[in-house]
């Protein structure tokens, strides 16, 4: 008999993290228990990784972050991530991610049952917002896209903020991989509560194609789960041996006071 499995990962505990833009769907199907891994690496920031088990629906839901894993990220050297509650996720390293002479990262995990989980990711080049503006209830951002297709995946987020509270947040997943030359582009979103805001925070992330596919599938899974409890949408991650994502991104942020 087939069983349903639930990724027990409540990401609202980790709101200081920069990814993902979508909450995780609670549902997953599979024949055997699996692991769920998320790791978003950003140059200049410490490494952080979330690892948890996917348990059968017959078991009580509980926070069950595994601390029995050997986690290593290979950059210009091997960096061990250790378990602990002081990190953003449940594995981390105080060592910051510095881009020197590398263009990719590799993840190597050995679980308590000696299962191997691996993944690799490229390191996107730095991204920069050219300018941004607010016109009525529109939040408009402009930035230069790359001539290289694999560098043209982005997440644009606009937040209307009042007294340190987010009144409204809009997220766009941008695929400009079909563009063949560098050039200035713009994207606008509508923020309904913009008249009550004190400032608009513009955030632009350059992400990998794997991360783009993952975030889009995450959004689709959430949409499906809102309308159906029986038809899960698979997540398009890049891990071998587990669900989830191992990826790298770069970011730029600007604030427009109102």
Language-model features, listed with the residues they occupy:
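N-terminal leader/targeting signatures
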Residues: 9-10, 242
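C-terminal motif of bacterial Sec signal peptides marking the signal peptidase cleavage site
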Residues: 14-17
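Compositionally biased amphipathic helical and low-complexity segments enriched in hydrophobic
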Residues: 10-12, 175
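A sequence/structural signal for flexible, mid-protein segments enriched
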Residues: 19-258
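Sec-dependent signal peptide recognition
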Residues: 2-9
């Amino acid at each position: 008999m087939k069983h349903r499995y639930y990724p027990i990962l409540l990401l609202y505990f980790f709101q200081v993290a920069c990814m993902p833009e979508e909450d995780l769907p609670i549902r997953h199907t599979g024949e055997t228990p699996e692991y769920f891994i998320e790791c978003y690496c950003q140059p200049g920031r410490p490494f952080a990784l979330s690892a948890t088990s996917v348990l059968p629906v017959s078991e009580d839901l509980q926070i069950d972050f595994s601390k029995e894993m050997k986690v290593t990220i290979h950059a210009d050297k091997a960096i061990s991530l250790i378990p602990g509650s002081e990190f953003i996720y449940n594995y981390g390293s105080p060592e910051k991610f510095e881009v020197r002479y590398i263009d990719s990262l590799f993840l190597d995990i050995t679980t308590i049952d000696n299962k191997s989980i691996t993944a690799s990711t490229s390191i996107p080049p730095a991204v920069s917002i050219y300018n941004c503006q607010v016109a009525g209830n529109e939040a408009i951002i402009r930035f230069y896209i790359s001539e290289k297709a694999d560098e043209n995946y982005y997440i644009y987020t606009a937040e209307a903020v009042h007294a340190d509270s987010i009144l409204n947040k809009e997220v766009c997943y941008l695929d400009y991989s079909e563009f063949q030359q560098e050039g200035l582009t713009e994207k606008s979103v509508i923020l309904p509560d913009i008249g009550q805001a004190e400032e608009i925070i513009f955030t632009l992330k350059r992400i990998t194609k794997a991360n783009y596919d993952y975030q889009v599938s995450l959004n689709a899974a959430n949409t499906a789960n809102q309308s159906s409890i029986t038809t899960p949408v698979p997540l398009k991650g890049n891990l071998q041996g587990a669900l989830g994502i191992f990826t790298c991104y770069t970011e730029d942020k600007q604030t427009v006071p109102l």
